[in-house]
Design a protein with these regions (language model features):
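Glycine-centered motif in EGF-like
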Residues: 1, 18-205
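Extended alpha-helical solenoid/rod scaffold regions
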Residues: 3, 11-13
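Eukaryotic short linear interaction motifs
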Residues: 8-10, 17-20
Length: 205
């Protein structure tokens, strides 16, 4: 089964709970299931497997492999995968837009976390700010939950208040990744651009 022509889920439907079955009567046996990225191989508009996609892919795979199949309905499995991948798509968009204006890199920091670093240059003030978004995943009730911990540090130039910059980013971006199309916060790129404008105005005073 594929989703968004980007990922493919392979599983044995017979090992999962049917809508009219008794969970208590099922044998608690988990059959192997797999989740692969297929977006790079499609003919129309192929999309490479990036570091952030790999992070989400592994996190989702670990989550669904931990589900008790005999007590889980297929619709709940599919929902967990789709909701989680929608969050991945939101992060992919955020990083892509952020990278348009600020050089951005991604580092894997553990099996369930990555660090997104971006450089904000404020040329009129000869100032460089390193922006970081630390993402950490864990299993939730419906797929994975991914926390966001933003921070900012002055590399050189004006000595702006680093905790306040981090607080600004947290307020604008939130502390958790939301599904693509359902976000209540601004994009990372817009938040960083707003921060740059505020710092420029403050530095000129």
């Amino acid at each position: 089964m594929t989703y968004r022509k980007e990922i493919e889920l392979v599983f044995d439907a017979s090992s999962f709970l049917s809508s009219n079955a008794n969970a208590a009567a099922r044998q608690p046996v988990n059959f192997r299931l797999d989740l692969w990225y297929i977006g790079a191989n499609r003919e129309l508009n192929p999309l490479p497997l990036t570091a952030e996609k790999e992070f989400f892919l592994q996190s989702i795979r670990d989550h669904i492999r931990g589900l008790p199949q005999a007590q889980t309905q297929v619709k709940d499995l599919l929902s967990a995968v789709s909701v989680s991948w929608n969050k991945a798509s939101a992060v992919v968009d955020d990083i892509r837009l952020l990278n348009v204006s600020c050089p951005t890199g991604i580092t894997k920091t553990s099996d369930n976390s990555i660090l997104v670093k971006s450089n904000l240059l404020i040329a009129p003030l000869t100032t460089k700010i390193e922006i970081s978004f630390h993402l950490t995943s864990q299993s939730g009730e419906n797929g994975i939950e991914v926390g966001i911990s933003p921070s900012a540090a002055v590399v050189y130039g004006e000595r702006f208040n680093e905790p306040k910059m981090g607080e600004f980013l947290l307020n604008r971006c939130g502390d958790a990744v939301e599904e693509k199309g359902h976000s209540t916060k601004v994009s990372w790129g817009n938040a960083v651009a707003e921060l740059g404008e505020k710092l420029l105005a403050r530095g000129r005073k």
